[in-house]
Amino acid sequence: MDLREMSTPALAYLGDCVLELCVREYLVESGLSTSRNLNREALNFVRASAQAEAMKKLFPILTEEEEAFFRRGRNIGHTNVPKNATVSDYRTATGMEVLFGYLHVSGQKERINELFRAAYLQDAE
């Protein structure tokens, strides 16, 4: 399937899962072991505000094609924005999810790992 023809909400749906898996793998590898601690810490990564902040770190290193997929996601017309997120953060987070969905579907696992590290782990290392 041509990625340009794949629905943007479908890419966001997949990207949400990809990001969640990256976060879960990182947290388990970091030594957290109870589901309560894992779930609480995961929220620090997957909240719309956290994803919007993470995207600021990614913009300088995105390719043109990656930027295009991000914009595609950011520009989805949202009708339901969670009450704990701003419209801007939610749109940016959706763009990030579409970006990671695109990378997953196109088989770019190393790029997913690279961007995840740059977005969330750069300051921690």
Set out the residue ranges of the language-model regions.
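Double-stranded RNA-binding/processing signature
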Residues: M1-E125
